[in-house]
Amino acid sequence: DVQCILTKKQGHATEIAQRLCDSGEELRFYACGGDGTANEVANGIIGYDNASMTVIPVGTGNDFLKNFGDDLDKFRDAENLWDGPQFPMDAIDVNGRIALTIACSGIDARVAADVHKYSESPLLDGKSSYIYSLAVNFLFKGIGSHWTVSLDDTVMEGDWSLVAVCN
């Protein structure tokens, strides 16, 4: 059986995935979107042994899928994904939420957050809204901040433009 559910707000994919996983039924999620949708579904299924996921790339960046090679078309064919291989994947725990491949804070995260705001303009498409966001953040918002980063028993403190933890 296949069920298509449209999300209605930010965080909705996480809520849906958790609710469905609670049934105990064996589930496979096909997150149709980009990195944000993939992250929401992953946060909804983490810790459930009865769920797996893949992504059909229709988002702005689709950076998560680029970790599996340059050919995004293989992920656009839902039939190809139907019985595709499954494998476990590590995740990064960031204050109770998970990140699949990278957790960033600083200039990179600001640029990514602003892309969505600028992409609402009828004059900018996905790529040009990214370039515009990059320019605005570097030219007008500054690039450095003071950070305290704790990782297990290690604490680091300093002024950096970007803090990233990668999986």
Regions found by a protein language model. Give the residues of each.
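A generic local structural motif
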Residues: T14-Q18, E40, Q86-F87, V149-L151
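Short, active-site-adjacent cap segments at secondary-structure transitions
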Residues: A13, T37-A38, D63
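Generic structural signal for well-ordered alpha-helical scaffold segments
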Residues: A17-C21, A42, V136
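Short Gly/Thr/Asp-enriched flexible loops that form oxyanion-binding sites at enzyme active sites
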Residues: T37-N50
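N-terminal glycine-rich "phosphate-gripper" loop used for MgATP/nucleotide binding
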Residues: A31-G36
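Catalytic core of DAGKc-family lipid kinases
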Residues: T7, G47-A164
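ATP/NTP phosphate-donor binding region
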Residues: D1-F29
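Short, intrinsically disordered, charge-balanced linker/junction segments flanking boundaries
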Residues: D1, V163-N167
